[in-house]
Regions:
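Mature, function-bearing regions of proteins
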Residues: 2-270
Length: 270
């Protein structure tokens, strides 16, 4: 995720109402990052994301299709990854970006897996970096009602941090609003925090058009903003980690079977 507010926010709480809105739907989101060392840097931007059942993705008219296209290959098979951990789900919801004009970038996609009786079975966070790697964290499978989870970092995300560290991830339930918080904790550094809050927007052509006009090429815009912040940090003297110079294909992720289900690394040196 990208962007960070100056103020510190608490862990996400359950939205009101707790019931999932009619799907598919849109969320108007604020996304932010907050860094405290070696320099202080906060930034925030606004965008929009989709919430839908992966078995029933949004289908828009041919006229508006360039504004929203779901491509399964843009994501890991999270249902299968949950099944690999013994978690069977009959419904899988995802909060994510859809391709706009053929391009998509998802720093983070959030999943909620439900059993046949409608109870929550697991949450998951699928993380993508700007180098083409992606990794899926299945969270609190033993206690899905718990909204806060911890997991060892398994993939390079920022070239300013090494591979080690531990995430604290908090995910609310989707409703009229939602909230996600990811905090990277390392013994030698102050916590780095990324967060996202969203407000439900009904899914109709008018709402999609208004958001697409307000945030043109939203996935590309998000990536550019993330990389722009990276350039600013580098210009302010924040050093790149030695390992990060081999980014994403040479350094292999470690395995934490308690929280990590899958990763994909692409060799960008080729």
């Amino acid at each position: 995720m990208a962007g960070g507010a100056g103020e510190q926010r608490g862990e996400p709480s359950s939205p009101d109402p707790s019931s999932v809105p009619t799907l598919p739907c849109l969320y108007h989101v604020d996304i932010g990052h907050s860094r405290r060392a070696p320099v202080r840097n906060d930034f925030k931007y606004r965008s929009y994301m989709w919430l839908f059942d992966v078995d029933e993705p949004p289908v828009v008219s041919k006229l508006w299709r360039p504004l929203a296209r779901y491509r399964p290959d843009d994501h890991l098979d999270v249902r299968r990854l949950m099944a690999d951990q013994g978690i069977e789900v009959s419904k899988l919801l995802v909060l994510t970006n859809l391709a706009v004009a053929g391009y998509v970038f998802n720093p983070i996609s959030i999943y909620w897996g439900y059993r046949e009786d409608g109870t929550l079975a697991a949450r998951a966070a699928e993380v993508h970096n700007t180098y083409g790697s992606r990794h899926c964290y299945v969270l609190n499978a033993d206690d899905p009602a718990k909204k806060v989870a911890e997991a060892n970092k398994q993939m390079y995300v920022s070239p300013f941090y090494p591979l080690d560290g531990r995430y604290r991830i908090s995910i609310s339930d989707p409703g009229s609003s939602l909230a996600v918080s990811v905090t990277l904790e390392r013994p030698e550094d102050p916590p780095f925090r990324a967060w996202m809050t969203g407000e439900h927007v009904a899914n109709n052509s008018g709402a999609l058009l208004r958001l697409a006009i307000r945030y043109p090429a939203a996935p590309l815009r998000g990536r550019v903003l993330i990389q722009w912040q990276g350039l600013r940090l580098w210009a302010r003297g924040v050093p790149l980690k030695k390992e990060a110079k081999l980014i994403a294909g040479i350094a292999q992720p470690r395995c934490d079977p308690g929280s990590i289900t899958s990763s994909e690394e692409k060799d960008m040196s080729k």
